[in-house]
Swiss-Prot record:
Belongs to the lin-8 family. The lineage of its organism: Eukaryota, Metazoa, Ecdysozoa, Nematoda, Chromadorea. It comes from Caenorhabditis elegans. It comes from the Eukaryota. The gene is lido-16. This is Uncharacterized lin-8 family protein lido-16. One of its GO terms (cellular component) is nucleus.
Length: 267
Protein backbone atom coordinates (compact mmCIF):
# COMPACT_ATOMS: atom_id res chain seq x y z
CA UNK A 1 0.00 0.00 0.00
CA UNK A 2 1.34 3.44 -0.93
CA UNK A 3 2.24 5.67 1.98
CA UNK A 4 -0.27 8.47 2.64
CA UNK A 5 0.43 12.02 1.51
CA UNK A 6 2.81 10.87 -1.23
CA UNK A 7 3.91 14.17 -2.70
CA UNK A 8 5.82 12.42 -5.48
CA UNK A 9 2.59 11.55 -7.29
CA UNK A 10 1.55 13.77 -10.19
CA UNK A 11 -1.83 13.64 -11.86
CA UNK A 12 -1.47 14.07 -15.62
CA UNK A 13 -3.98 16.91 -15.95
CA UNK A 14 -2.20 18.89 -13.22
CA UNK A 15 1.45 18.57 -14.23
CA UNK A 16 1.36 21.07 -17.09
CA UNK A 17 -0.43 23.77 -15.09
CA UNK A 18 0.74 23.17 -11.54
CA UNK A 19 2.91 26.29 -11.32
CA UNK A 20 1.46 28.51 -14.04
CA UNK A 21 -0.40 30.78 -11.68
CA UNK A 22 2.15 30.79 -8.87
CA UNK A 23 3.44 34.22 -7.92
CA UNK A 24 7.07 34.51 -6.89
CA UNK A 25 7.42 35.80 -3.34
CA UNK A 26 8.52 39.39 -2.83
CA UNK A 27 10.08 40.14 0.52
CA UNK A 28 8.56 42.96 2.57
CA UNK A 29 11.67 43.28 4.75
CA UNK A 30 13.20 46.77 4.60
CA UNK A 31 16.91 47.33 5.02
CA UNK A 32 18.14 48.20 8.51
CA UNK A 33 17.85 51.86 9.41
CA UNK A 34 21.43 53.16 9.24
CA UNK A 35 21.05 55.82 11.93
CA UNK A 36 18.92 53.82 14.38
CA UNK A 37 19.60 54.43 18.07
CA UNK A 38 17.82 51.39 19.50
CA UNK A 39 19.59 48.84 21.64
CA UNK A 40 18.62 45.34 22.61
CA UNK A 41 17.82 46.58 26.11
CA UNK A 42 15.38 49.09 24.58
CA UNK A 43 13.46 46.24 23.00
CA UNK A 44 13.64 43.99 26.07
CA UNK A 45 12.31 46.78 28.30
CA UNK A 46 9.47 47.42 25.85
CA UNK A 47 8.61 43.73 25.57
CA UNK A 48 8.57 43.32 29.35
CA UNK A 49 6.02 46.13 29.73
CA UNK A 50 4.03 45.34 26.58
CA UNK A 51 0.31 44.71 27.12
CA UNK A 52 -0.68 41.80 24.90
CA UNK A 53 -3.68 42.67 22.75
CA UNK A 54 -3.64 39.71 20.38
CA UNK A 55 -1.92 39.28 17.01
CA UNK A 56 -1.54 42.34 14.76
CA UNK A 57 -4.51 42.99 12.48
CA UNK A 58 -2.55 44.63 9.68
CA UNK A 59 -1.85 42.28 6.78
CA UNK A 60 1.35 44.15 5.97
CA UNK A 61 2.67 43.72 9.52
CA UNK A 62 1.90 40.00 9.39
CA UNK A 63 3.80 39.77 6.11
CA UNK A 64 6.73 41.63 7.65
CA UNK A 65 6.82 39.25 10.63
CA UNK A 66 6.70 36.12 8.47
CA UNK A 67 9.29 37.44 6.00
CA UNK A 68 11.68 38.25 8.84
CA UNK A 69 10.92 34.90 10.48
CA UNK A 70 12.25 33.10 7.40
CA UNK A 71 15.76 34.31 8.27
CA UNK A 72 15.60 32.52 11.65
CA UNK A 73 14.88 28.82 10.97
CA UNK A 74 15.58 27.94 14.60
CA UNK A 75 12.12 29.40 15.33
CA UNK A 76 10.14 27.26 12.86
CA UNK A 77 12.11 24.03 12.31
CA UNK A 78 11.87 22.83 15.90
CA UNK A 79 8.86 21.80 17.96
CA UNK A 80 9.78 24.20 20.74
CA UNK A 81 11.80 27.40 20.56
CA UNK A 82 13.29 29.62 23.23
CA UNK A 83 12.15 33.12 24.07
CA UNK A 84 15.57 34.71 23.36
CA UNK A 85 15.11 33.73 19.72
CA UNK A 86 11.78 35.59 19.59
CA UNK A 87 13.33 38.58 21.32
CA UNK A 88 16.05 38.62 18.69
CA UNK A 89 13.38 38.54 15.97
CA UNK A 90 11.56 41.47 17.57
CA UNK A 91 14.81 43.42 17.90
CA UNK A 92 15.62 42.69 14.25
CA UNK A 93 12.26 44.15 13.17
CA UNK A 94 12.82 47.18 15.41
CA UNK A 95 16.20 47.82 13.80
CA UNK A 96 14.77 47.54 10.30
CA UNK A 97 11.54 49.47 10.71
CA UNK A 98 11.51 51.29 14.04
CA UNK A 99 8.34 49.28 14.77
CA UNK A 100 8.02 47.68 18.21
CA UNK A 101 6.20 44.35 18.08
CA UNK A 102 6.09 42.30 21.28
CA UNK A 103 7.16 38.67 21.41
CA UNK A 104 3.59 37.58 22.23
CA UNK A 105 2.38 39.10 18.96
CA UNK A 106 5.26 37.54 17.05
CA UNK A 107 4.55 34.08 18.48
CA UNK A 108 0.80 34.32 17.93
CA UNK A 109 1.26 35.46 14.33
CA UNK A 110 3.47 32.44 13.68
CA UNK A 111 1.16 30.07 15.58
CA UNK A 112 -1.89 31.17 13.58
CA UNK A 113 -0.04 30.93 10.26
CA UNK A 114 1.27 27.49 11.15
CA UNK A 115 -2.17 26.21 12.13
CA UNK A 116 -3.58 27.45 8.82
CA UNK A 117 -0.90 25.71 6.74
CA UNK A 118 -1.06 22.51 8.80
CA UNK A 119 -4.83 22.33 8.39
CA UNK A 120 -4.57 22.84 4.63
CA UNK A 121 -1.86 20.20 4.21
CA UNK A 122 -3.72 17.72 6.42
CA UNK A 123 -6.94 18.19 4.43
CA UNK A 124 -5.16 17.78 1.09
CA UNK A 125 -3.33 14.71 2.39
CA UNK A 126 -6.63 13.07 3.33
CA UNK A 127 -7.93 13.87 -0.17
CA UNK A 128 -4.88 12.19 -1.72
CA UNK A 129 -3.62 15.33 -3.47
CA UNK A 130 -0.06 15.79 -4.70
CA UNK A 131 2.26 18.48 -3.39
CA UNK A 132 1.66 20.61 -6.48
CA UNK A 133 -2.11 20.38 -6.06
CA UNK A 134 -1.76 21.17 -2.35
CA UNK A 135 0.36 24.20 -3.19
CA UNK A 136 -2.31 25.48 -5.56
CA UNK A 137 -4.95 25.06 -2.85
CA UNK A 138 -2.81 26.99 -0.37
CA UNK A 139 -1.86 29.77 -2.80
CA UNK A 140 -5.24 31.50 -2.37
CA UNK A 141 -4.24 32.50 1.16
CA UNK A 142 -3.03 36.11 1.45
CA UNK A 143 0.05 35.14 3.48
CA UNK A 144 1.07 32.06 1.52
CA UNK A 145 3.98 33.60 -0.40
CA UNK A 146 5.36 35.03 2.84
CA UNK A 147 5.03 31.67 4.57
CA UNK A 148 5.94 29.42 1.64
CA UNK A 149 9.19 28.48 3.39
CA UNK A 150 7.22 26.78 6.16
CA UNK A 151 4.94 25.05 3.64
CA UNK A 152 8.01 23.54 1.95
CA UNK A 153 9.46 22.53 5.31
CA UNK A 154 6.18 20.98 6.44
CA UNK A 155 5.85 18.99 3.24
CA UNK A 156 9.22 17.41 3.98
CA UNK A 157 8.44 16.78 7.66
CA UNK A 158 4.65 16.47 7.67
CA UNK A 159 4.68 13.63 10.24
CA UNK A 160 4.88 16.09 13.16
CA UNK A 161 1.91 15.29 15.45
CA UNK A 162 -1.06 17.66 15.52
CA UNK A 163 -0.54 18.18 19.25
CA UNK A 164 2.53 20.29 18.46
CA UNK A 165 0.49 22.98 16.67
CA UNK A 166 0.10 25.03 19.85
CA UNK A 167 3.65 24.48 21.09
CA UNK A 168 5.79 27.55 20.46
CA UNK A 169 7.38 28.81 23.66
CA UNK A 170 6.36 29.60 27.20
CA UNK A 171 9.64 30.64 28.81
CA UNK A 172 10.31 33.62 31.06
CA UNK A 173 12.76 36.17 29.79
CA UNK A 174 15.03 35.47 32.74
CA UNK A 175 15.59 31.90 31.55
CA UNK A 176 17.35 33.06 28.41
CA UNK A 177 18.61 36.55 29.28
CA UNK A 178 21.20 37.37 31.92
CA UNK A 179 20.31 40.43 33.93
CA UNK A 180 23.15 41.33 36.27
CA UNK A 181 22.50 44.54 38.22
CA UNK A 182 26.18 44.78 39.13
CA UNK A 183 27.16 45.36 35.50
CA UNK A 184 26.88 48.70 33.67
CA UNK A 185 23.91 48.86 31.22
CA UNK A 186 26.15 48.66 28.15
CA UNK A 187 27.85 45.50 29.40
CA UNK A 188 24.49 43.90 30.20
CA UNK A 189 23.32 44.72 26.67
CA UNK A 190 26.49 43.29 25.11
CA UNK A 191 26.12 40.18 27.25
CA UNK A 192 22.52 39.70 26.13
CA UNK A 193 23.38 40.23 22.46
CA UNK A 194 26.12 37.60 22.70
CA UNK A 195 23.68 35.10 24.23
CA UNK A 196 21.03 35.74 21.58
CA UNK A 197 23.48 35.58 18.69
CA UNK A 198 24.97 32.33 19.94
CA UNK A 199 21.47 30.88 20.31
CA UNK A 200 20.85 31.30 16.57
CA UNK A 201 23.78 29.00 15.78
CA UNK A 202 22.22 25.94 17.43
CA UNK A 203 21.70 22.81 15.39
CA UNK A 204 18.39 22.78 13.55
CA UNK A 205 17.60 19.31 12.20
CA UNK A 206 19.73 16.17 12.62
CA UNK A 207 20.17 13.80 9.66
CA UNK A 208 17.68 10.93 9.69
CA UNK A 209 19.09 7.42 8.99
CA UNK A 210 17.70 5.77 5.86
CA UNK A 211 16.23 2.78 7.72
CA UNK A 212 14.28 5.19 9.94
CA UNK A 213 12.68 6.69 6.84
CA UNK A 214 11.64 3.23 5.59
CA UNK A 215 10.10 2.45 8.97
CA UNK A 216 8.36 5.83 8.95
CA UNK A 217 6.75 5.18 5.56
CA UNK A 218 5.57 1.74 6.66
CA UNK A 219 4.12 3.18 9.87
CA UNK A 220 2.26 5.89 7.96
CA UNK A 221 0.73 3.30 5.67
CA UNK A 222 -0.44 1.14 8.59
CA UNK A 223 -1.96 4.14 10.34
CA UNK A 224 -3.85 5.15 7.22
CA UNK A 225 -5.02 1.57 6.72
CA UNK A 226 -6.39 1.46 10.28
CA UNK A 227 -8.18 4.80 9.85
CA UNK A 228 -9.72 3.66 6.57
CA UNK A 229 -11.12 0.56 8.25
CA UNK A 230 -12.26 2.38 11.39
CA UNK A 231 -13.21 5.98 10.54
CA UNK A 232 -13.84 8.21 13.52
CA UNK A 233 -11.18 6.47 15.63
CA UNK A 234 -8.41 8.98 14.92
CA UNK A 235 -8.28 10.33 18.48
CA UNK A 236 -8.19 6.84 20.01
CA UNK A 237 -5.47 5.75 17.59
CA UNK A 238 -3.41 8.85 18.30
CA UNK A 239 -3.66 8.33 22.07
CA UNK A 240 -2.72 4.67 21.71
CA UNK A 241 0.34 5.47 19.60
CA UNK A 242 1.65 8.23 21.83
CA UNK A 243 0.96 6.26 25.02
CA UNK A 244 2.94 3.34 23.61
CA UNK A 245 5.80 5.56 22.42
CA UNK A 246 5.98 7.29 25.79
CA UNK A 247 6.10 3.91 27.51
CA UNK A 248 8.98 2.81 25.30
CA UNK A 249 10.84 6.07 25.81
CA UNK A 250 10.49 6.14 29.59
CA UNK A 251 11.61 2.58 30.33
CA UNK A 252 13.80 -0.13 28.83
CA UNK A 253 11.37 -3.04 28.33
CA UNK A 254 12.65 -6.51 27.48
CA UNK A 255 9.56 -7.78 25.65
CA UNK A 256 6.17 -6.77 24.30
CA UNK A 257 4.52 -8.56 27.22
CA UNK A 258 6.48 -6.44 29.68
CA UNK A 259 5.72 -3.26 27.73
CA UNK A 260 1.96 -3.86 27.56
CA UNK A 261 1.85 -4.99 31.17
CA UNK A 262 3.49 -1.72 32.19
CA UNK A 263 1.09 0.31 30.04
CA UNK A 264 -1.90 -1.58 31.44
CA UNK A 265 -0.90 -0.88 35.03
CA UNK A 266 -0.68 2.85 34.30
CA UNK A 267 -4.06 3.18 32.53
Amino acid sequence: MDSPFNFTRRRSHVVANERRDMIQPSSSIPRPITNNIWTLNDYLNFDKSDVHTGPPRSLEIKKLILDTLKEMPELWTQRCSKKPHWELLGFNILQRTGMRIGTCQLMETFRNARKHVNAKIRKCWKEGLSKAETEIKCSNWDLFENFRFFFEFKCRHWQFPDDCDDLVVELDTEEGIISNPSLPPNEVCDQNVEILQSATKESIMPDVPEHYLDFEQHLKAKIQQALNKHPGQEKLLKNAIFTTLNGIENRDHKSLEELFSSLSSNH
